[in-house]
């Protein structure tokens, strides 16, 4: 069987208005690949967090004028999503060390502010890598557990 790959690229302004467009595109890409509802919802949350972080932090010095690039690579058993910007970078390891682990008994009023998006992204996706060379690039992978829909080989003629 021949392996099938598709690649979809989006460029959107760094504005919160475009998060819903990206989520809709993601839903279509994941549905077409046969992903489960839960996988689609997990990926939508993770991508929303990553894009919102880029909108909120990457271009704050430039009055949020900038571009966010989104790539979907559909492979046989997984979908790789890459979100990148050319804005201000941050120290991923330092931020990550400040955000967790969370204690389930911790009073919600005293939870640390910030960084929860990174925690969610890592919790919901199967693989996450952050690069910070010129801007920030987040690469996320979700392994696809295909919906179990049987192919019905028997066809019934209806006249």
Swiss-Prot record:
Highest taxon above the source species: Bacteria
EC category name: transferase
Record's keyword annotation contains ATP-binding: yes
One Gene Ontology biological process: negative regulation of DNA-templated transcription
Keyword set, alphabetical order: ATP-binding, Kinase, Nucleotide-binding, Serine/threonine-protein kinase, Transferase
One function term, GO molecular function aspect: protein serine/threonine kinase activity
Keyword Nucleotide-binding tagged: yes
Enzyme Commission code(s) on record: 2.7.11.1
Gene3D superfamilies tied to this protein: Histidine kinase-like ATPase, C-terminal domain
Reactions it catalyzes: L-seryl-[protein] + ATP = O-phospho-L-seryl-[protein] + ADP + H(+); L-threonyl-[protein] + ATP = O-phospho-L-threonyl-[protein] + ADP + H(+)
Family: Belongs to the anti-sigma-factor family.
Described function: Negative regulator of sigma-B activity. Phosphorylates and inactivates its specific antagonist protein, RsbV. Upon phosphorylation of RsbV, RsbW is released and binds to sigma-B, thereby blocking its ability to form an RNA polymerase holoenzyme (E-sigma-B).
Name of the protein this chain belongs to: Serine-protein kinase RsbW
Lineage of producing organism: Bacteria, Bacillati, Bacillota, Bacilli, Bacillales
Gene: rsbW
């Amino acid at each position: 069987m021949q392996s099938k790959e598709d690649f979809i690229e989006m460029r959107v302004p760094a504005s919160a208005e475009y998060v819903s467009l990206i989520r809709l595109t993601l839903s279509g890409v994941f549905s077409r690949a046969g992903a489960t509802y839960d996988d689609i919802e997990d990926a939508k949350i993770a991508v929303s967090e990553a894009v919102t972080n880029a909108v909120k932090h990457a271009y704050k010095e430039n009055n949020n004028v900038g571009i966010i690039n989104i790539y979907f690579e559909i492979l046989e058993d997984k979908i790789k999503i890459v979100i990148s910007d050319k804005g201000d970078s941050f120290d991923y390891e330092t931020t990550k060390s400040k955000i967790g682990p969370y204690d389930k008994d911790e009073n919600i009023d005293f939870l640390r502010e910030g960084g929860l998006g990174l925690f969610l992204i890592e919790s919901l996706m199967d693989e996450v890598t952050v690069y910070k060379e010129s801007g920030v690039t987040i690469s996320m992978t979700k392994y696809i557990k295909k919906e179990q829909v049987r192919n019905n080989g028997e066809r019934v003629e209806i006249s």
